[in-house]
Amino acid sequence: MGTSASSITALASCSRIAGQVGATMVAGSLLLLGFLSTITAQPEQKTLSLTGTYRHVDRTTGQVLTCDKCPAGTYVSEHCTNTSLRVCSSCPSGTFTRHENGIERCHDCSQPCPRPMIERLPCAALTDRECICPPGMYQSNGTCAPHTVCPVGWGVRKKGTENEDVRCKQCARGTFSDVPSSVMKCRAHTDCLGQNLMVVKQGTKETDNVCGVHLSSSSTTPSSPGIATFSHPEHTESHDVPSSTYEPQGMNSTDSNSTASVRTKVPSDIQEETVPDNTSSTSGKESTNRTLPNPPQLTHQQGPHHRHILKLLPSSMEATGEKSSTAIKAPKRGHPRQNPHKHFDINEHLPWMIVLFLLLVLVLIVVCSIRKSSRTLKKGPRQDPSAIMEKAGLKKSLTPTQNREKWIYYRNGHGIDILKLVAAQVGSQWKDIYQFLCNASEREVAAFSNGYTADHERAYAALQHWTIRGPEASLAQLISALRQHRRNDVVEKIRGLMEDTTQLETDKLALPMSPSPLSPSPIPSPNVKLENSTLLTVEPSPLDKNKGFFVDESEPLLRCDSTSSGSSALSRNGSFITKEKKDTVLRQVRLDPCDLQPIFDDMLHILNPEELRVIEEIPQAEDKLDRLFEIIGVKSQEASQTLLDSVYSHLPDLL
């Protein structure tokens, strides 16, 4: 029994292990299938991403076909037809295409790079050849020039690139540059005080600070009582030289370690004076003034720098006992004496002077704004809108006749007021139109509502106030307001008044008016019959008979929905589209660029292949539209009307 139980347990464990292994294999196979599906999906995505199309005119049938573009690195070797797709071919050597295209020939690569330029990108099927200047040079006037080397005392302000030269700047105070370079910036002077040293020689724009050890804190060995120590940051070795003066009594020899661990700085000219000259031994009086009792002792420090210490004998004694002709002075104790007459540097004080000037300008602006606000408050509250309307009514009689006749259209000996025509048609919508034209407030609208009894009276008074309030009021603005509030019927009536082909009925032009201060003549109430209605009749002057209605661009806006009449100048020359209408469309298109391709697509069935080829050779879309106007305008009135309908359907802002 025990053996059978153990065997059953072993079989169960084996089955569990096999189940786990099987599950692991299934999971691995699923991951492998997912990875392969992603790999195979990538080229499909790439092929689906080629969504660009182009238009091609089949020369045999004359049809305009839409073909798929070829991918980058290829060109169209055969255009598509009704039964076949386009054929793409790889760009030959020396040519390339960067993007999807529908061209029949690849672009030629640029010429090989002239010396000393080097090639950054080679000529390939997808890229053009790109040439750059080698490192250390930049491109100037088509050639490579070396970067400028900043002289001593100047540092690099901006590093040079392949297209820009190095910019240098003079080292500011506290910095220096002792070597000419085209890459190094100005370095800061060594902080002697931070290293517990004294400044022996002040640095300039071309040299660094020279540091020395404080004599009060320096130490010497017992055998050499007078030692002056100097160091220079550019040398890794220094020499202990006996100075011409002895150190004060009481210096401890235990402080020598501090002397050895401190590195002082000395310029190269001072170091050359302190190094002994043992090359000439023949002349005892000329070359033995400075001697070394012992060879220089090399002492290695634990830091990265080490130095030699030269010990000079007292300069007052020679080797023979005679006095020396030259004496080397040791550095004095304490800090260097400051120059009482310091030079004024404008560059140092320029930042805070600029800030002070800006603050002064800001204060002046605030003071002026406060004074202006106080003057505005002293003027008192604004006048009541009703008083403004009364003044406007009084000024109406004083308005020049020329401004009043601007809104009157003379026809068959009758003067028809456009404002009265609009006021009789808009009804209660006059409030919205008036607010759109004048940006008027509710109080101003309420002033018209309380002063008149009928809507057409309020509308006429509001429109007259608009013409008085804004001298730039024009018929174009009025038409824009009517179209904004979907009153195209009123616009059609105005256009019919100005067109010679439409006759307005007398009952539509008769405006019922009640007597009011703003009415030029008493007119019966609306309840009176039609035969009692009258028109504003004004005999035109001889000059007004030859004057066009509205000198501005309002007339092309009114006539934009139809082609020119037979009496226009362009119609007599063979075009069915007026020059004013074409210029208005082209001017708007040039001011506000938009996609004109849908307009060209609508005209494809009207144009023949030769005309289509002429239009496609024009690079600019605006010039293409201009040429399209010229071609379509001489075909027929139906073709001209089709072009205008397409223009105003795709460019609604022109309406």
Swiss-Prot record:
Family annotation (Gene3D superfamilies): Death Domain, Fas, Tumor Necrosis Factor Receptor, subunit A, domain 2
GO terms under cellular component: plasma membrane
Biased composition (Polar residues): 241-262, 276-302
Low complexity compositional bias, start-end: 216-225
Entries under InterPro entries matching the protein: DEATH-like_dom_sf, Death_dom, TNFR/NGFR_Cys_rich_reg, TNFR_21, TNFRSF21_death, TNFRSF21_N
Membrane-spanning segments: 350-370
Modifications the protein undergoes after translation, according to the UniProt entry: Oxidized in response to reactive oxygen species (ROS), leading to endocytosis.
Protein name: Tumor necrosis factor receptor superfamily member 21
Protein's gene: Tnfrsf21
